Regions:
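Short, surface-exposed basic-aromatic patches at helix termini and helix-loop junctions that form
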Residues: 30-34, 122-129
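A structural signal for well-ordered alpha-helical scaffolds and beta->alpha junctions
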Residues: 43-46, 88, 92, 117-121, ...
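PAPS-dependent sulfotransferases, especially Golgi type II membrane carbohydrate sulfotransferases
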Residues: 99, 126-188
Length: 188
């Protein structure tokens, strides 16, 4: 979106690592030219995110992780994280921290972006002081494997209807503070 609308270059993994990583701390990112970068941090509702993560986990080194029922997957320890919800909390907290430390950043809830791309186009235009750029909407689903025209973005972002037990399991690891920072509400 930012590349198409504002002719921005994407920095690859040799610049501060993998896009899904925990945001680097100042002693790491300060070694790079962050002054000329716009960092775009994308947040996703943890209730729809965990379902997507279950379907296509970042951590697929454990061959049977995709075979776990959702309840077991949510409680499965991933790398240094107690579970995927703890990972969601820590990663999003790290994005807020880094956003506060660096000169140019924007935090976007993907659900809000999907509803009103014009608002985010205007926010980025303000940051870049480039109000002459027309809005080119992004209407296809994009992930690390590329663009997917057949995937319905709105339905993939919709919060699933979980049973009470699953909601309790998810909520037991969710940080209310992080949820508030992300403008999400706990399911009850």
């Amino acid at each position: 979106f930012a590349g198409k609308n504002f002719n921005l270059k994407f920095q690859h993994y040799n610049f501060l690592g993998w896009k899904h990583r925990l945001a680097p701390k100042k002693d790491e990112w300060s070694k790079f030219d962050v002054q000329s970068c716009l960092f775009i941090f994308c947040m996703r509702n943890p209730y729809s995110w965990v379902q997507a993560m279950h379907r296509e986990p970042y951590y697929d080194h454990y061959p049977k992780i995709k075979d776990l029922p959702l309840e077991n997957f949510i409680q499965f320890s991933i790398e240094d994280y107690e579970n995927c919800i703890a990972m969601w909390n820590q990663k999003n907290d790290s994005y807020f921290r880094m956003s506060d430390e660096i000169p140019n950043s924007i935090i976007i809830n993907v659900e809000d972006f999907n509803v009103d791309q014009g608002k985010f186009h205007a926010n980025i235009a303000d940051i870049l002081n480039r109000h002459d750029m027309p809005l080119v909407k992004m209407n296809s689903y994009v992930n690390g494997r590329g663009r997917h025209e057949q995937k319905d973005i709105t339905s993939s972002l919709r919060v699933p209807k979980y049973d009470e037990k699953l909601v309790r399991i998810i909520n037991s690891s969710l940080s209310e503070e992080t949820m508030k920072k992300c403008n999400y509400e706990l399911l009850i």
